[in-house]
């Protein structure tokens, strides 16, 4: 290491206790880490340049120092207060025809996360996203879909301000955590019980594309509350309530329901089945409105086996879910990727839909995951138009890389 060479020439590194370096053989990283430990014990005797070199070495050998039991809790502050991570995805989908540019989609996505430690209680985070359609000649567009500041005065309480992701239901059938929420969130979670409240704009909700019900749908503000109970290592039950502040004000809204407010509530659970590797999960969500708007139900239930661990190549997961959504149940929602096609079909055609979802994932290498899904057996019901056909089967496969 050049850093150790500099410190040796400065007569700071003095070798093993017997004053030698054991000949000309190469030192292991753990032996070098032990030298760094000895230098850290004498840090007050080093000059500014030597301390800077030591800090750089401590960052380079952080894993070895941690394995040796050396406390390096302040190391990040010494070598910089910004950490970077990211993921990339290569994806092929066979979609429904609908309003999409083409039935078969081949896309790539790159996301870069930046987390800046402002102080012991505040972290500012951002995420850059660049997506490219490989069947289109256009260049990729890069946006920032996350920028928020999180304050955690203790291990249980938190407050988050800015554009962020929130989780409402257990499965993501109603709201995908990757969706954008612009607002403020405050919560408490002690590992057994959690409560969270938020106020802001759900930018990716289905109604954000809808100019029939709201004149300026993108600016609609909402508030939500959520309660969660944790038990076991990864089992939980939860319930939420979500309400739009603005009433229906679109020019095409029937006068009898103009000004009506729409809200949704839901409850769900994820339950591990002992040491079998199996778990069941599900959600029930009801979207309602006053002034005779009625209600629409959305529910899902499924069985999963295994879990993908990106540090363990060969680890895998399998799952199957059943989904049933009344017409209009998706108004305030933004579902997870592998369920979007059929739910949007029901919304666009004014019909209820029910279908099956099968999915699988496997860690093919460290930090590389192969995922696939297949939506099948879809049926339309309570059709607004009797000529509406059943949705076709859809499927997709993708490679995800974490770094």
Predicted stretch roles:
Residues 1-89:
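N-terminal periplasmic/intermembrane-space "pro-region" immediately following the signal or transit peptide
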Residues 15, 120-122, 127, 156-157, ...:
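A generic structural signal for ordered secondary structure
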Residues 20-26, 91-103, 134-139, 152, ...:
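Outer-membrane beta-barrel pore domains
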Residues 42-44, 187-190, 346-350:
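Short, surface-exposed, polar/charged, turn-prone segments marking secondary-structure boundaries
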Residues 42-43, 49, 96, 124, ...:
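Generic macromolecular interface patches on structured domains
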Residues 62-85, 225, 230, 234-237, ...:
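Charged interaction patches that mediate protein-protein contacts
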Residues 81, 87, 93, 101-210, ...:
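Outer membrane beta-barrel
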Residues 203-275:
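Extended alpha-helical regions
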């Amino acid at each position: 290491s050049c850093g150790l060479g500099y410190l040796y020439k400065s007569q700071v590194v003095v070798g093993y206790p017997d004053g030698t370096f054991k000949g000309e053989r190469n030192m292991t990283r753990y032996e070098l880490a032990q030298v760094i430990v000895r230098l850290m014990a004498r840090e007050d005797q080093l000059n500014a340049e030597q301390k800077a070199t030591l800090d750089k070495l401590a960052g380079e050998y952080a894993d070895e120092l941690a394995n040796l039991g050396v406390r390096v809790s302040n190391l990040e502050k010494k070598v910089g207060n910004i950490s970077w991570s990211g993921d990339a995805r290569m994806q092929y989908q066979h979609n429904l025809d609908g309003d999409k540019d083409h039935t078969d989609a081949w896309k790539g996505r790159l996301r870069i996360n930046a987390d800046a430690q402002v102080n012991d209680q505040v972290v500012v985070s951002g995420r850059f996203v660049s997506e490219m359609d490989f069947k289109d000649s256009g260049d990729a567009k890069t946006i920032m879909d996350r920028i928020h500041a999180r304050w955690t005065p203790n291990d249980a309480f938190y407050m988050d301000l800015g554009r962020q992701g929130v989780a409402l239901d257990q499965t993501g059938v109603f709201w995908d955590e990757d969706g954008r929420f612009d607002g403020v969130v405050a919560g408490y979670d002690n590992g057994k019980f959690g409560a969270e409240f938020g106020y802001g704009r759900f930018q990716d909700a289905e109604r954000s594309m809808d100019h029939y019900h709201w004149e300026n749908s993108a600016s609609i503000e909402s508030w939500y509350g959520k309660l969660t109970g944790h038990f076991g290592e990864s089992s939980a039950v939860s319930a939420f309530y979500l309400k739009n502040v603005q009433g229906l004000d679109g020019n095409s809204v029937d006068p009898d329901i103009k000004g009506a407010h729409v809200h949704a509530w839901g409850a769900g659970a994820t339950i591990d089945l002992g040491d079998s590797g199996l778990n069941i999960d599900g959600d029930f969500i009801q979207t309602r409105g006053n002034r005779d708007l009625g209600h629409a139900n959305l529910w899902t239930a499924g069985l999963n086996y295994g879990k993908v661990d990106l540090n363990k190549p060969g680890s895998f997961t399998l799952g199957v879910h059943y989904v049933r959504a009344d017409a209009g149940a998706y108004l305030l929602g933004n579902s997870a990727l592998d369920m979007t096609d059929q739910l949007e079909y029901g919304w666009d055609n004014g019909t209820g839909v029910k279908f099956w979802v099968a999915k699988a994932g496997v860690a093919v290498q460290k930090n590389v995951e192969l995922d696939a899904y297949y939506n099948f057996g879809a049926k339309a019901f309570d059709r607004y138009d009797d000529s509406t056909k059943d949705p076709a089967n859809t499927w997709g496969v993708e490679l995800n890389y974490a770094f």
